[in-house]
């Protein structure tokens, strides 16, 4: 890579930075993202309310009109922008991966680096610019996040396809999301890190040279994609359309497709529906050699105003457009919904060929030119396909699904409509966030459905009585705190899944997760269920959910330990096993969880990095993280009741002892194992053993910024502040999934919610 010009800039922000000196330094930047400071909207701006006031039908009419309003500066293929806008929406939502819930279209991140400059997103800068007059017209009533996806829906409808519906409610973010791991490669289209036998990419725009890759590979049919990634190359959304590493091998391509789409939470039927449905429209672009394509938006000259990939081939647009380097139009009706894609896939035999840009693709054997030219109505072309298209026919499972869809057009249309809706909404979280006139009423199996509360909820008097009942069960307070925290902290701010609402900790698979300490969990749940049954049997009309009681149990124990009033807001309900996709929820199980002193690091990720990642998913700030760790430790909320980090002589009482003892200069720490995961604290003078702790504890004394926070709480005047801050952070985590509540101090435009 070329030398970074910022390092030479002798102004604020320039020069050699800390991370240049110490690349392994633990970075807290992902805990400082998307704060009110970076948000230009008013603090009390309520996006949900603004969206509800939107002239939704007027917006859709404007979008429909845009589809055929071809602009000279960026003309529409076939006189219709539908294919371009479908790709824009797909590539916005399609970055989602179920492994950590990150990516997706829920925050409008396609506007920012690196996504706005990925080689797979060439020309989508033009798509968003075409949308600007409409965004400008409707202002803050429609976010970019919603607009990018709604436009894809309208594009489909404008070409005769009936969609499944649409839900708005995605507030925008205002900066690039630095928390997403997109891979470790340093060149576009490289994959040498995510695969053991991957290849380096290249500087600038281009295509992967499959012929060269083929010489170097031993087996592209058996390889494992690094987790949590869901794309086969740096800068691609899914797989290489030319084939694995540019090699036109449809069978191997099918394997890559199954992995990448699977990590986006799609099964085989949904995968086929999305590919076959999406490729029923538009075309790819590879009119000439890719060396004609200039710098991506983030590297383009300032006068280009955020547009990139200037093209010196011919006119640089229209019939001379170069994006992927592939030149394929799949059907004879690229602006109209129909069965053309599947019909052509099976009508012809296919053979490899090259695009004008030198990319590997396929052409129909013994075929007549039946494919329209995008700009010359008097010209016809031979049918062409991508390696990823031929893969659907060559893979036995995909082939069976394709033939079924081909024989049953209505089934295919329904499957595509549902898969497309899932693609656009998978990272939106529960239905309580879905707003707008086109929200479907059908409960979908992937939406983590929680029934609405249809009974009278408990009041303050009930809450006080129930807290006494819970404490009277004899369950140890530390166990009540552990289970409440375990339930609530399953939440992921990335895709808004998990959390205490629904009480899914009592259901498979969470009830058997090792981190949840199943034996302790069963004991606590049994006690809470008895309290629930007694209350519900004796109250006329009123009910209390187990989800509420799990949180209330933690609140009662915390009040006893702190002497403070801990806020509690009832209104949660209980989910069912029927509405809990076991396979999907397995991805929420943590490998390591520093909050509960569970697990340890790997060769690639240190324990403390897992902790910061987990804090980021919980939308915590660095001070909130610090307060929670200190409190959970002295409250003995560790996995398996371990003493790791319980740096106090009064366990079970909320004090600042954790920080006082961690920062005690009279204590010397030494590793207790060869891995450097567990440490023993010794008295410097007597050499007596005092404490045991893990890396997730010692980092608060070793890391300069975390130590600075710990010092605030360790000071003589820090205990009361610590207790208040812990209770506030606890309350926040208990309610992270309460989208039915307006989050105080954040406004509903807050992207982390």
UniProtKB/Swiss-Prot annotation:
<dbReference type="InterPro" id="IPR000763">
    <property type="entry name" value="Catalase_peroxidase"/>
</dbReference>
<keyword id="KW-0376">Hydrogen peroxide</keyword>
<dbReference type="Pfam" id="PF00141">
    <property type="entry name" value="peroxidase"/>
</dbReference>
<comment type="similarity">
    <text>Belongs to the peroxidase family. Peroxidase/catalase subfamily.</text>
</comment>
<dbReference type="InterPro" id="IPR019794">
    <property type="entry name" value="Peroxidases_AS"/>
</dbReference>
<dbReference type="GO" id="GO:0042744">
    <property type="term" value="P:hydrogen peroxide catabolic process"/>
</dbReference>
<keyword id="KW-0408">Iron</keyword>
<dbReference type="InterPro" id="IPR010255">
    <property type="entry name" value="Haem_peroxidase_sf"/>
</dbReference>
<comment type="function">
    <text>Bifunctional enzyme with both catalase and broad-spectrum peroxidase activity.</text>
</comment>
<keyword id="KW-0560">Oxidoreductase</keyword>
<keyword id="KW-0349">Heme</keyword>
<feature type="binding site" description="axial binding residue">
    <location>
        <position position="279"/>
    </location>
    <ligand>
        <name>heme b</name>
    </ligand>
</feature>
<keyword id="KW-0479">Metal-binding</keyword>
<feature type="site" description="Transition state stabilizer">
    <location>
        <position position="87"/>
    </location>
</feature>
<dbReference type="InterPro" id="IPR019793">
    <property type="entry name" value="Peroxidases_heam-ligand_BS"/>
</dbReference>
<dbReference type="GO" id="GO:0046872">
    <property type="term" value="F:metal ion binding"/>
</dbReference>
<keyword id="KW-0575">Peroxidase</keyword>
<dbReference type="InterPro" id="IPR002016">
    <property type="entry name" value="Haem_peroxidase"/>
</dbReference>
<dbReference type="GO" id="GO:0005829">
    <property type="term" value="C:cytosol"/>
</dbReference>
<dbReference type="GO" id="GO:0070301">
    <property type="term" value="P:cellular response to hydrogen peroxide"/>
</dbReference>
<comment type="subunit">
    <text>Homodimer or homotetramer.</text>
</comment>
<protein>
    <recommendedName>
        <fullName>Catalase-peroxidase</fullName>
        <ecNumber>1.11.1.21</ecNumber>
    </recommendedName>
</protein>
<dbReference type="GO" id="GO:0004096">
    <property type="term" value="F:catalase activity"/>
</dbReference>
<keyword id="KW-0963">Cytoplasm</keyword>
<feature type="region of interest" description="Disordered">
    <location>
        <begin position="196"/>
        <end position="220"/>
    </location>
</feature>
<dbReference type="GO" id="GO:0020037">
    <property type="term" value="F:heme binding"/>
</dbReference>
<feature type="cross-link" description="Tryptophyl-tyrosyl-methioninium (Tyr-Met) (with W-90)">
    <location>
        <begin position="238"/>
        <end position="264"/>
    </location>
</feature>
<feature type="cross-link" description="Tryptophyl-tyrosyl-methioninium (Trp-Tyr) (with M-264)">
    <location>
        <begin position="90"/>
        <end position="238"/>
    </location>
</feature>
<feature type="active site" description="Proton acceptor">
    <location>
        <position position="91"/>
    </location>
</feature>
